[in-house]
Amino acid sequence: RYYTFNREDEGEVNERMGCSAQWFKTGHKFYAVRDDSRKVEDLWLIDALAEPRPRLKTYKAELAGDKNVIQFELLIGDANTREVKKINIDRWKDQYVDILYASNDAKRLYFQRYKRTWDECEICVVDTETGEVKVLIHEVDKPYLDYQMRAIHFLNDGNEILFRSERSGWGHYYLYDKDGNL
């Protein structure tokens, strides 16, 4: 439950959680982000509307200043070879990771990682054959990056990336090529 492929934002349905594992379009490779919240501390709420009596709800929650926060792993598997690779995505301590786009040929997987302070991020691509990670875009925005306004679009199967940034103080879109060149 706390070292899982289930994504919290998928929501619980009949005590079942959604899974972060996704198939590439080719159908023989898959990728998944695994969340490790085993060391994250518990938080409690009282459900005062529960019948017949109020009920205590316990869940894991990260709070500002906590030493133990969710850790992320990226795995890529190949059903034909029955091989699963753990990809080295570590850049910053306690980083946050999002999958952005999977190429049609299953050779590239794009992800974004954020520094815990949310003032720095990187758009990266993984070569699914070798497991090599390459940084395409490195963004710094003080005091923090606006996660709600982020916009990243992959055009022509990842050959071009349209990326929204406020690096100038204003929100602008920048067009990058597949190698991260502006």
Q: PLM ranges: what are they?
A:
Residues 39-45, 71-73, 118-124, 169-174:
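Structural motif
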Residues 78-82, 128-131, 177-181:
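Short loop/turn segments that connect beta-strands within beta-propeller blades
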Residues 2-22, 32-86:
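Predominantly five- to eight-bladed beta-propeller fold
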Residues 17-19, 70, 96-98, 119, ...:
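Beta-rich catalytic cores
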Residues 22, 31-37, 64-68, 102-105, ...:
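Beta-strand C-termini and the immediately following turn/loop, strongest in propeller blades
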Residues 8-17, 92-97, 141-149:
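Short glycine-/Asp-/Thr-/Trp-enriched loop segments that recur within the blades
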Residues 1-6, 85-88, 133-138, 182:
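Beta-propeller fold detector
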